[in-house]
Amino acid sequence: MVYTALTWQRLHGTAAGLVPSHLPQEGEKGSTHPTPRPLGTTPRVTAHIEPPRPWAAGAEPPLPAGDGSARESSPFIGSAAADGDSLLEGKNMALFEEEMDSNPMVSSLLNKLANYTNLSQGVVDHEEAEDSRPRESKAPCMGTFIGVYLPCLQNILGVILFLRLTWIVGAAGVLESFLVVSMCCTCTMLTAVSMSAIATNGVVPAGGSYYMISRSLGPEFGGAVGLCFYLGTTFAGAMYILGTIEIFLTYISPGAAVFQAETPEGEAAALLHNMRVYGSCTLALMAVVVFVGVKYVNKLALVFLACVVLSILAIYAGVIKTAFDPPDIPVCLLGNRTLARRGFDTCAKVRAVSNGTATTALWGLFCNGSSLDTACNEYFAQNNVTEIQGIPGVASGVLLDNLWSAYSDRGAFVEKKGVASVPTPEDGRASGLPYVLSDITTYFTVLVGIYFPSVTGIMAGSNRSGDLKDAQKSIPTGTILAIVTTSFIYLSCIVLFGACIEGVVLRDKFGEALQGNLVIGMLAWPSPWVIVIGSFFSTCGAGLQSLTGAPRLLQAIARDGIVPFLQVFGHGKANGEPTWALLLTALICETGILIASLDSVAPILSMFFLMCYMFVNLACAVQTLLRTPNWRPRFKYYHWTLSFLGMSLCLALMFICSWYYALFAMLIAGCIYKYIEYRGAEKEWGDGIRGLSLNAARYALLRVEHGPPHTKNWRPQVLVMLTLDAEQRVTHPRLLSFTSQLKAGKGLTIVGSVLEGTFLDKHVEAQRAEENIRALMGAEKMKGFCQLVVSSSLRDGCSHLIQAAGLGGMKHNTVLMAWPEAWKQPDSPYSWKYFVDTVRDTTAAQQALLVAKNIDAFPQNQERFSEGSIDVWWVVHDGGMLMLLPFLLRQHKVWRKCRMRIFTVAQVDDNSVQMKKDLQMFLYHLRISAEVEVVEMVENDISAFTYEKTLLMEQRSQMLKQMQLTKGEREREAQLIHDRNTASHTAASRAQAPPTPDKVQMTWTKEKLTAEKHRNKDAGAAGFRDLFSLKPDHSNVRRMHTAVKLNGVVLSRSQDAQLVLLNMPGPPKNRQGDENYMEFLEVLTEGLNRVVLVRGGGREVITIYS
């Protein structure tokens, strides 16, 4: 190097006479420091974090609220608002000052990056519109228990538990019921694991499950799944309303029925008609409540949840009570057939009276008269009437009788196993007799379809994401705990029901053998009414919640605009309430109510929820297998095999429940998918397989041509700029090794190089060079494209590659090149000029630039680092690429065991403690694990080392401009000038008097003493003396000060790092200082082993929402 005579001692000493008087001396006031920024200001950030755009020309940046800081009001170093009296104001970061408007200091952004605020929608807007008083904006404050666990618990536990679980246990037996519940709970648990990975892959937006799914799956899948989720939620509302009416008409007020059955055979039809009438009225009432006062629905949610919890506690209390005091609940059997307790009170054929024997009311139901000699039903005549206990208790041993299934056909008798019965030929099996009959045909798959809705509701926590204090932590924890809790409740209830309740009572769906009482209510303690009233209010509340959530879901889909014919439903009242969406939801819900049967509606919503869960698992599996850069879930306990198993289980359950419903639901989802995908797109058919492949490639290229990818989907698509030697071999093969470690075979990689000359003369060399490059790419196992350009100059060839490499949307957004190590050597005098122009070209093309320094020291793919660190020095914020690179590198085996450390620089007036907290919070939201350190750079005086290094740099530059030398002579002449200058200063220093106290003694080195003894006494040296009287430019002094200071700080902490990533300052706007720019970068990275200089292009973004 030119400056070999400069020693480390000069960092601490000042050469006499070298520091001009206008520089601030030790103890003098060189600059004024403004008051620190108040810590209370927390700006709201609700979108992805991008580099801020420059302010309007001539305008001052807005002053943050409550901050009177002069520097904060003008955050750009060297701006017009800076203190004009101090030429060295902000000299610590002067190297980056020309781009401070677009790439601000990290310290000025950390507070905004870390302390984002979610915007909640829907209900909050409605409440604020209805309340005339001004509200203070409240930060999200819900924790895991209140915000996720309890809502999931309320949504999962519901109508099926109270109305159908005992019947499922009776029909399928304890073992098969256990299998049904285990399958469904396993399905939701695997889905919850996949959902947790998706929910923790970025900040969950305040829009709930649809936003989470659609932003992960894309518009096509997102729209299809979103509509399936909407239809499932809507039919869930119908199911809850039907459950509410069934409880009311069957167990609370049977006399309120509008339609009365004249015969026992007409009871089922009358019940369906009553369900339709009351269900429609209830739906209308609930829709009015949701339209008028949705805030009351949310305030009553805890009341409804309390009903559910109390009902479940009453069940467990009743089970415990049966162990020592079983209730007296007699059930009447005729032979082995269960009798419905209607029209008789005594379970006997005859009864004893004072003067003999008399027939009972039961006799009159089976015989033509009340006398003992009248003709009776043959089965009644040949079988005895017995009475058993309906709930014999836990200690009775009835569990063994209930272990196995007892499926039956529709209209079959509910019979007790093991009881003697004399079969008789029947004509008209029931014919109006008081038997308990099966109302539907039961088998395993039917019960799965009916039961599955009881495990849905796992997304209730993510629907409240905008109100959660820490959604990334609360959603996985609360959801999985809720599923574990409810799974335990369901599985334990299956065993307890089978151990406590007689089998015929379990199979009695409507409690006809118990005088029309709810079976699970008769088990509960202290009263059956606890269960009846609790289940009534819980199902009513669940229906209200469905009618509240479904219209908002439809409104979100409509506002996304992915399904054009639904856009009308995105509008609503002035306060944002989804009026039209509520109307459509009520109409769809009415179709479910007109079906009128809870057992028929349940499989429908099972299909839609299973479809939704299947795509959630698919999304997680695909994201994991693709390893996209934005896939960094904070929830680590997921694997693609679990997601694939969950997806397969969802698909299997769909066809188990009902194959024709499954095909119908998939057809709906497929039609929606294709409608969104091909909306406005032209289809073109090719000929044969080749034509199909070419058409698919063309279609895919046209799809990505329409615009740049969304910021969340940004990933580095790399153009690698290689240099070739005279034999067309790659000069730095490890640049390709580094590329393969960075890309890991994913995304686009273009390897480019330039040959100087004309294509007619160089086409053979070009082919040989391309073959060499492809062979090297194969050796490095790197998949990509090779593009070689022959150009009249290297400069133009590099520019052409940057502009034109790639095809259509498959274009690079990042340029990777090696640092020109020989830029000072005589044989490559223009290498620095090509390099600086390439930097400018990438900036103009809005492409990121990676410059690998000391590339030959980088590891090959076969090497492994067993320890060490990747150090990121984040000085200015230019889009977040610095954060993304170490994450991508650590996916490769070479760098996997390296830990990541992030350093950022604080100035004197920055609160470094708060900066560290903000940076840790920002990294937490980015899902990046790294050690964090804030380094304080004190604005001390510029050292003599910096001043003299700047002076020598400018003298060399000025001399080369004055002397018209040949290319080979320039470097040698510059070295000669440096030697003469050294000798001249040595002679002048000897003639001087001893230093005064305000001067600092120069430290002499052995090299300088040798130079003094053997100095060149050529008289021509005097001719250069006027050149050395120049004073260095103040801006160059400040830039060199930045480079020296920052280099010293980086060396002190990262000298032993395996890799250092550092912000790359932009080239000067004045092209006359290009060679100085190279010197600044050289000083900035001096002493570091492996360095990658990173310069953002403005489009790359790493976001907290990815």
UniProtKB/Swiss-Prot annotation:
Q: Name one GO molecular function term.
A: metal ion binding
Q: Taxonomically, which superkingdom?
A: Eukaryota
Q: Which residues are glycosylated?
A: 336, 355, 384
GO CC, sorted alphabetically, is: plasma membrane; synapse
Region described as Disordered: 17-83, 980-999
The record's NCBIfam families line, in alphabetical order, gives: 2a30
This protein is called: Solute carrier family 12 member 7
* Species per Swiss-Prot/TrEMBL record: Oryctolagus cuniculus (Rabbit)
Q: What's the source species' lineage?
A: Eukaryota, Metazoa, Chordata, Craniata, Vertebrata
Q: Which gene encodes it?
A: SLC12A7
